[in-house]
């Protein structure tokens, strides 16, 4: 991102008066949460890279795919949330503007939008272009809106463009901390603003990260999951030529976790240096079971140049049972009365066993269930793993 900064992500799981994440920060986030529940109908989160990917993971885990179709009561008062700024796509943005316009027409003059614009420099092309188009569209349609800016607040003498805009227009502001790259920023206000606006358990998320941080300080490699992962992947790359990593959680709620990991791995290992040879792996985002019908044949029968990283959730919230409604068809009989999430995990196990039986490198991380605590564990483990590697 320009000049080198210290790497301070290891401080992020802890709330302290003199830390990066403070009690005062949490208080402001909870005030934002309570305000939005009573005053905001729709949030549009505008950002790219680390200013988008971690927030999207939080949204997907907390809200799921159909959040914006629920009633206000079903959302417990929390606003709808859409994302923009992660690309410069006029068709996508026009569709979003039309959606906001329709919602405003349906509710009337009480309808209100919150634009959350996140940019460290305040001049990143994609989010700022999207933001300016969205703001003008809301103004032209007389739709009530307010702006929250998340940007670098560290330099009072040379404020970012976005911070200057926020001061001039009296917008609420939150901070992108010094020493925390975008790939780690989900554990800061960058991710927490989104978290607060949809009712995600921020303190549970940090507790999971802190639990994993403690494990990652263990000197015994077999008690340190991040160090073990880093060592195995390094050996796989340098000794066995496994220079591609397929990151493959099973379940739609974790689809965006793959995209987040692609950035984390790429920006952490893809470094130019005058003191060492180039190193890294090419990350490939995948999701099960969908990509079992797209990528997996190549994983199982293609070149021996990949490691596959699975993420498994043991118990899902809604293990819907397949009804035994077409049992006269022999090939469908086995599905009757089986939980659909059981099918998901059986598919993962079968994929893993097929790879292992052919000496194709893979590893599986299993969590008991998917919640804020275990998500914090998963994400912080991978932060430490790329650091160790």
Labelled PLM ranges:
Residues 1-37, 325-330, 334:
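Extended, charge-enriched "interface" segments that sit outside catalytic cores
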Residues 28-41, 97-112, 231-243, 299-304:
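Glycine-rich phosphate/diphosphate-binding loops that line cofactor/substrate pockets in enzymes
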Residues 34-219:
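Glycine-rich phosphate-binding loops that contact phosphosugars or nucleotide phosphates
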Residues 89-91, 233, 330:
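A gly/proline- and charged-residue-enriched helix-loop-helix capping module
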Residues 139-309, 314-318:
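Active-site phosphate/pyrophosphate-binding segments
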Residues 284-370:
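Helicase-primase coupling helices
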Residues 363-389:
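C-terminal helical/tail subdomains of lipid-metabolizing enzymes
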